[in-house]
Regions:
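Thiol/selenol-based redox catalytic cores and closely related redox-interacting motifs
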Residues: 34-118
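Local sequence-structure signature of Cys/Sec-based thiol-disulfide redox active-site neighborhoods
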Residues: 1-23, 27-32
């Protein structure tokens, strides 16, 4: 079973959840605001995703903008970025879909289909 991590009020997350339900994909739901990802989880997900760490940031979020992360991220180390992401789930791009051997960040139907539809 995959883990589906999102913010329920996010419209992209709502579309992703509907897609999972419509395709009868079993998932474990987790509200990213109520249950913030831990530093260890973020390290594991980053490694498993193969993506640059900057892709894990919710660049359209108010918190990202208020912290001026657009200008700060280029000078931060991966450790500093991971620690920052672990402080608030609203900094993390969502939804996240996590399987045994993959992590998908954001909702792209084609990518999700390739990973979970048999």
């Amino acid at each position: 079973m995959v883990k589906f991590i999102c913010y329920p009020k996010c419209t992209t997350c709502q579309k992703a959840r509907k897609w999972l339900d419509d395709n009868k994909i079993e998932y474990e739901f987790r509200d990213i605001k109520l249950n913030n990802p831990t530093l260890d989880e973020l390290k594991e997900w980053h490694k498993k995703s193969g993506l640059p760490l900057k892709k894990f940031f919710n660049t359209s979020g108010l918190l990202y903008k208020s912290l001026d992360l657009k200008n700060k991220l280029p000078t931060m180390t991966d450790d500093d970025m991971l620690k920052l992401l672990a402080t608030d789930g609203m900094l993390v791009k969502r939804p996240l879909l996590i399987g045994d051997d993959f992590v998908l960040v954001g909702f792209k139907e084609g990518d999700w289909s390739a990973k979970v539809i048999k």
